[in-house]
Regions:
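Surface-exposed acidic/polar loop and edge beta-strand patches at domain peripheries
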Residues: 1-147, 151, 155-216
Length: 216
């Protein structure tokens, strides 16, 4: 695993702006020039997936660079109201890869970052937005509690009619995980869980009042 300092050094050498909430040993590094991605550091180890080559290189029409971390995406991706197929094939819109994220509020344990991002859906409807991430942390024994509030705010002046657009924030958080990897969380309601690909019932169960999901 990469250390927090190694990641901030890599971002700096790659001419990427970053912002730290907390400390470089226990905190959250926001990569402001990489779609506002977040990288969480616990006990001086970056727990998110990090792809150095995608930090050094830039996304363009021919190749999308996925640096890892935790990023805010607009939903839906597909359908006539989605945002990732406006040219016929999947792509991350340049308005997202080129968004200029800024720190608009900061404190030792809380930061707010924001970017203007104009979205275009498959109906070719333009939707001017602000993307915002509110990052809050609390240090605990041998760990870190992190809370991120995701916001996509419509800032246009025209009233959008029902059926002409859909818009919701979702976060894609990436980790490198082996065969023993698992995620634990408070039990969600049955209506809040569904499978995007293959059935996953065999990989998730309740243990000691916690929902445990095997990652492989």
């Amino acid at each position: 695993m990469m250390t927090g300092r190694e990641l901030t050094d890599l971002l700096s050498k790659s001419y990427r702006r970053s912002h730290l909430t907390g400390t470089v040993e226990n905190g959250v590094i926001a990569a402001l020039d990489m779609e506002g991605r977040l990288f969480t550091v616990v006990n001086n180890k970056v727990i998110n997936r990090v792809v150095p080559s995608a930090i050094i290189n830039r996304s363009n029409k021919n190749a999308y660079q996925n640096p890892g971390g935790d990023t805010l995406w607009p939903a839906p991706e597909g359908t006539s109201l989605g945002y990732e197929y406006t040219t016929g094939t999947w792509r991350v819109p340049p308005s997202i890869t080129g968004a200029v994220w800024e720190v608009v509020e900061e404190a030792p344990d809380r930061s707010v970052i924001r970017a203007e991002t104009d979205l275009v859906n498959n109906l070719q409807t333009g939707i001017p937005c602000e993307f915002e991430r509110i990052i809050e942390i609390k240090a605990i024994d041998n760990g870190l509690i992190q809370k991120v509030t995701e916001i996509i705010r419509y800032v246009g002046t025209r009233k959008l009619q029902k059926g002409t657009f859909l818009l919701a924030p979702w976060s894609l958080c990436q980790f490198d995980s082996g065969t023993l990897g698992k995620v634990t969380m408070p039990p969600p309601g049955k209506e809040d869980i569904w499978d995007y690909y293959e059935p996953s019932e065999s990989q998730r169960q309740l243990q000691n009042n916690l929902y445990v999901v095997q990652t492989k």
